[in-house]
């Protein structure tokens, strides 16, 4: 159960302060950072165990005089489990490294870690259950508990539906503020008089500092000139093609983030489906960055698992690359309009059902259970 506690004129002895006065929110957010990483570590461990157990099963379980692992659709799930497992570990290593280093402003990074781990971890365990078939449901075969427990991870430590708009909003805050500042300085405001608009816009049109920011943005938004892709460097030459692909993905994501802001204007604040796509794209890009960094380090140190992990890395890279392209493509081609209509229709129908026959939250302001 949860409850609200209100403090009125409470005096706290100085020796009881947990941190510094006025810095309590920082303490709370720091706890969230650690909680999201420890949760993700547990998810990674469960996913690894599920992959090992289910693969052992299909290696030794025969159908049609062949082990199940020889069938391509089963192999697809095996490959996906181990590839995504590598991605999970890579992201976790990177972000927990930031924590150990003492980085302070990593709320977006830990939120990304939580969202990615809870979603991908669930997919791994679900694949494991699928290839074990009905045996996966049996308590003695271990996966039943892993599968059941994995579902809660997308809800706790900040549900993914809350984290996605947060990643979008906080992660894109600087760019959004820059775009809004330019718009306010140089766009016509219908609430102002003609003279007020002219007085504001004309000086800004010859302001060198403002023009330096506005011209590249305008050419990108209205003329389609996309800025150069950022440089992604690696120590080992075999990774250069992957670094280039990652660079192109970053370029595409950054461009479409700006374009989405142009397409939806002020409504982007309430278009959570759009926000979620951009958030997921950023999440997968960050995971790819962690993977490239990790495999680069493994190559340089000739890690004992390098040969195996290179195979997992390459498959995970392609899987996440495809997911990024899909998320960005759906910014323009999607079912959002019909979704909103269907949801409204369903809500209207649901309102016709008697409240007395359903469980309703005890604090509901609109109905009693």
Regions found by a protein language model. Give the residues of each.
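Flavin-dependent oxidoreductase catalytic core characteristic
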Residues: 1-75, 79-369
């Amino acid at each position: 159960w949860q409850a609200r506690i209100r403090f009125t004129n409470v005096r706290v002895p100085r020796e009881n302060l947990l941190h510094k006065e006025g810095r309590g929110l920082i303490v709370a957010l720091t706890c969230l950072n650690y909680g999201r990483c420890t949760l993700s570590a547990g998810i990674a461990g469960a996913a690894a165990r599920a992959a090992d157990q289910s693969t052992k099963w299909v290696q030794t379980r025969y159908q049609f005089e062949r082990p199940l692992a020889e069938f391509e659709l089963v192999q697809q799930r095996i490959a996906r489990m181990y590839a995504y497992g590598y991605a999970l570990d890579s992201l976790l290593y990177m972000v927990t490294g930031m924590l150990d280093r003492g980085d302070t402003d990593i709320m977006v990074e830990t939120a990304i870690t939580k969202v990615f781990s809870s979603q991908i971890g669930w997919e791994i365990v679900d694949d494991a259950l699928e290839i074990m078939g009905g045996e996966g449901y049996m308590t003695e075969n271990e996966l039943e508990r892993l599968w059941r427990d994995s579902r809660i991870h997308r809800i706790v430590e900040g549900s993914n539906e809350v984290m996605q708009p947060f990643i979008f909003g906080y992660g894109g805050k600087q760019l959004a503020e820059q775009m809004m500042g330019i718009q306010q300085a140089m766009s016509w405001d219908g609430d102002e008089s003609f003279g007020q608009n002219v007085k504001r816009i004309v000086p800004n049109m010859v302001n060198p500092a403002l023009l330096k920011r506005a011209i590249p943005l305008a050419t990108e938004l209205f003329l389609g000139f996309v800025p150069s892709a950022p440089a992604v460097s690696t120590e080992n030459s075999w990774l250069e093609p992957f670094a280039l692909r990652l660079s192109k993905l970053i370029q595409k994501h950054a461009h479409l983030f700006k374009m989405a802001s142009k397409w939806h204007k002020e409504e982007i604040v309430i278009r959570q489906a759009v926000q979620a796509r951009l958030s997921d794209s950023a999440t997968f890009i960050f995971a790819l960055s962690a993977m490239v960094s990790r495999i680069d380090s493994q190559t340089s140190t000739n890690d004992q698992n390098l040969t195996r992990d290179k195979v997992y890395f390459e498959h995970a890279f392609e899987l996440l690359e495809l997911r990024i392209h899909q998320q960005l493509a759906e910014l323009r081609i999607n079912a959002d309009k019909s979704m909103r209509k269907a949801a409204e229709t369903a809500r209207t129908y649901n309102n016709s059902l008697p409240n007395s026959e359903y469980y309703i939250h005890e604090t509901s302001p609109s109905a009693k259970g």
